């Protein structure tokens, strides 16, 4: 075999290795949950990065499904002929995988370094970096007033004269030097244990709750309870959350939280848009109590307000009890 032929073998091997590495770094990692407004975590990071790659999202990648992400999702759905509902389900995830690219290693590394970047797609990786330290700024914003970091010389400058004066007093030959604080104790206000967080990506992780429900599920259920029953007695709010769970356990209804809540004509809050209001802590607590076994509804799968109900069918359902303004039934 000629020398040229021998040279082709390592080159082909290198090309194969690089192609395999490329496939590895761009593999998707979407979970099975339907991603919607209010969600947080790795799914949202991937969603934002993919939407940014194709030009639909131009805000920072922070792992929080806010309104900018919501409208980016709707615009993507419209452009690709899908149902425009702002929900990221299996169909949209599959479409994103076909139309975009996602390098998890690169995105995670940028987030780990606390960098704020808003140009993921179509830009060379070496310039896809914002000013370092955005993670620290976000953390300070969440935790309130904090002591200055020791690695930020601009903020620590006033402390330097104190550290320098103390040693000079000790060097003077005065017979009775006036007592001064020990120099090693000076820097103590600047020792910050939380700095260890710099080694982790600044992303809010989705949290699992009882029975395997994700934080995304909790958020959506809390929005439904708030939209349907705010102002009702607390037990009535728990009962509304219990109805959602009872439907999940019934073969008559969808088998996931978003499917139950967004089923056509199922909830008034979805029809009038109140589902997108920000829930309060009471609504969230009601959901958690229902998840932990409380069911004031008595196993109901329906409820209605007798003062506003116009459907003859709902009045025909076997009634269980009334809590506040709602009648619960099956």
Curated annotation (Swiss-Prot):
One of its GO terms (biological process) is sporulation resulting in formation of a cellular spore. Gene3D superfamilies: 6.20.240.60, Cell wall hydrolase SleB, domain 1, PGBD-like superfamily/PGBD. It comes from the Bacteria. It holds the Pfam family Hydrolase_2. Belongs to the SleB family. Residues 174-187 have a biased composition (Pro residues). The keyword Signal applies. GO terms for molecular function: hydrolase activity. The keyword Hydrolase applies. Residues 1-29 form the signal peptide. Keywords: Cell wall biogenesis/degradation, Germination, Hydrolase, Signal, Sporulation. Residues 134-173 have a biased composition (Basic and acidic residues). Residues 117-195 are annotated as: Disordered. This is Spore cortex-lytic enzyme. The gene is sleB. Required for spore cortex hydrolysis during germination.
């Amino acid at each position: 075999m000629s020398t040229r032929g021998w040279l082709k073998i390592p080159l082909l091997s290198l090309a194969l290795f690089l192609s395999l590495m490329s496939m590895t770094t761009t593999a998707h990692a979407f979970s099975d949950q339907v991603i919607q407004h209010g969600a947080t975590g790795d799914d949202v990071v991937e969603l934002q990065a993919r939407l940014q790659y194709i030009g639909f999202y131009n805000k920072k990648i922070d792992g929080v499904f806010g309104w900018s992400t919501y409208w980016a999702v709707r615009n993507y759905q419209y452009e690709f002929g899908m149902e425009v509902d702002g929900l990221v389900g299996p169909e949209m995830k599959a479409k994103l995988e076909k139309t975009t690219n996602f390098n998890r290693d690169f995105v995670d590394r940028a987030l780990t370094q606390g960098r704020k970047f808003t140009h993921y797609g179509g830009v060379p990786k070496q310039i896809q970096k914002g000013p370092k330290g955005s993670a620290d700024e976000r953390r300070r914003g969440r935790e309130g007033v904090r002591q200055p970091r020791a690695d930020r010389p601009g903020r620590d400058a006033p402390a330097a004269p104190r550290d320098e004066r103390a040693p000079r007093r000790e060097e003077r030959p005065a017979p009775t030097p006036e007592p001064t604080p020990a120099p090693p104790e000076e820097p103590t206000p600047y020792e910050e244990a939380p700095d260890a967080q710099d080694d982790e990506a600044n992303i809010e992780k989705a949290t699992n709750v009882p029975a395997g429900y994700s934080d995304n599920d909790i958020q959506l259920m809390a929005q439904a309870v708030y939209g349907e029953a705010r102002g009702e007695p607390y037990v009535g709010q728990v009962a509304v959350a219990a109805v959602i769970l009872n439907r999940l356990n019934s073969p008559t209804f969808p088998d996931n939280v978003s499917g139950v809540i967004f089923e056509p004509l199922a909830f008034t809050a979805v029809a009038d848009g109140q589902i997108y209001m920000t829930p309060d802590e009471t609504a969230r607590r009601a959901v958690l109590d229902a998840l932990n076994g409380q069911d004031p509804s008595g196993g109901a799968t329906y409820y209605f307000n007798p003062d506003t109900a116009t459907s003859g069918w709902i009045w025909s359902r076997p009634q269980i009890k009334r809590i506040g303004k709602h009648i619960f039934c099956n």
